[in-house]
């Protein structure tokens, strides 16, 4: 989901 994308983006 969108939250996952934000998580990977932070990494």
UniProtKB/Swiss-Prot annotation:
Keyword Secreted appears in the UniProt entry: yes
The answer to keyword Secreted applying to this record is yes
Signal peptide (residue range): none
Q: What is its main location?
A: secreted
Keywords, A to Z?
Amidation, Neuropeptide, Secreted
Query: What species was this sequence derived from?
Result: Rhodnius prolixus
* Protein name in UniProt: Tachykinin-related peptide 6
User: Which positions does the record annotate as the modified residue Arginine amide?
Assistant: 11
Source species, domain of life: Eukaryota
